[in-house]
Swiss-Prot record:
Native source organism of the sequence: Canis lupus familiaris (Dog)
Subunit structure and binding partners: Homodimer (in vitro). Heterodimer with other retinoic acid receptor family members. Binds DNA preferentially as a RAR/RXR heterodimer. Interacts with NR1H3. Interacts with AKAP13.
DNA-binding region: 205-270
Stretches annotated zinc finger (NR C4-type): 205-225, 241-265
Gene this chain is encoded by: RXRB
Function: Receptor for retinoic acid. Retinoic acid receptors bind as heterodimers to their target response elements in response to their ligands, all-trans or 9-cis retinoic acid, and regulate gene expression in various biological processes. The RAR/RXR heterodimers bind to the retinoic acid response elements (RARE).
All residue ranges annotated as the NR LBD domain in the record: 296-529
Protein name: Retinoic acid receptor RXR-beta
Amino acid sequence: MSWAARPPFLPQRHAAGQCGPVGVRKEMHCGVASRWRRRRPWLDPAAAAAAAAAAGEQQTPEPEPGEAGRDGMGDSGRDSRSPDSSSPNPLSQGAPPPSPPGLPLPPSSAPTLGGSGAPPPPPMPPPQLGSPFPVISSSMGSPGLPPPAPPGFSGPVSSPQINSTVSLPGGGSGPPEDVKPPVLGVRGLHCPPPPGGPGAGKRLCAICGDRSSGKHYGVYSCEGCKGFFKRTIRKDLTYSCRDNKDCTVDKRQRNRCQYCRYQKCLATGMKREAVQEERQRGKDKDGDGEGAGGAPEEMPVDRILEAELAVEQKSDQGVEGPGGTGGSGSSPNDPVTNICQAADKQLFTLVEWAKRIPHFSSLPLDDQVILLRAGWNELLIASFSHRSIDVRDGILLATGLHVHRNSAHSAGVGAIFDRVLTELVSKMRDMRMDKTELGCLRAIILFNPDAKGLSNPSEVEVLREKVYASLETYCKQKYPEQQGRFAKLLLRLPALRSIGLKCLEHLFFFKLIGDTPIDTFLMEMLEAPHQLA
């Protein structure tokens, strides 16, 4: 559209005063129209004169350097929402901009006063306050209140009071009144053990775990481990382990491997020199007395021998009846029946023999019954095995009956019969075991601390240790040329245990079948383990 075809309403609107300061766009239109009419006064002279007068009033003050460029811009140079040049600047008076309280105003949110290619607006004067956001400045300015941490925040806090509460006592990071009590489980804090802890009760043996009787040779131990260590040091004994030198040494298995038990004594801290000093003090007091002279006095071997001889005399009186030593004519042909009858008769004499063993009668009556029920089979097997030393290929029972090897095989008990002959009778014959040594071995079997139901196993263990010491002293005095005799005697104990268990299996089998007559006393012994359980 050319300027000549301009609609005639523009001069009337300008003449009516509608081009006042209501907007940038209208002002621009008025300025252009006034200049256009000045060039063409033939269109409307009156309107041109009024427009010239109005334009002269607005251009009377001297324009600033940046306003000339703004007057010549198009529609894109100004925003219709921008304030007029006559309106005051709110930021120059210190008022905050229209932004949410407490949030910083990003630079992009400031009003743009200049377009592309235009010079930047003049810098605003600095605000009167320290920060244009009074809410944030007031909260940051108070040193006593730290900013609240968001939920789940675990990072460091810059408040000195919080730092003082986190620091441990003694760190010097805050006044004592700011230090809070530490929470349980903080590393570095030492909490005393409760008064009812493990150290408050009775101590246990460091070697086998049994009840300790005090500190012996530098270590809390029971009487059994104390005597074992003392005997090993005084006699300078050497042991060997049949396994990998890692046997279990506890209350029930401490007697199975002497090597591992001795090594554990040394590992827990038992001192060899303490035993030697004790032995030296004993020599100083007793003069020429032996170092182990107290052990035979506590468990004299002569009393053990008397018990063996007394039981043997009663057995011989019974043998002189019908049949004698070879009396197979008046006895049943079944060897199993003969063995069961002989065992039943020997059980009566076994009780009398046990009462003659030193210190056995001093035990509680219930413990005496438990010990007899636990070892009666091994005690009887050891007795008739030693009695059969002079018998060839057979055993001699307490009743005077002789059971041959062939008879045992025909009765179906040949395997266990052969073990008795090879592992017991033959070994006893080769080493010429006497009755004192037999009595000591049987006493060791009798004092079994591993029997179930004992009221005081430690006391039984002490008695067994005394028998060990007495037997060792006897072997060294009676057979000084045989250094390993004591060890050979002890090696018969595992064989007795194994054969005794196997014999019990056979007896239980015969009892279930019912073909073999079993007398009352033997039947009670066979039922004893079930009664104890």
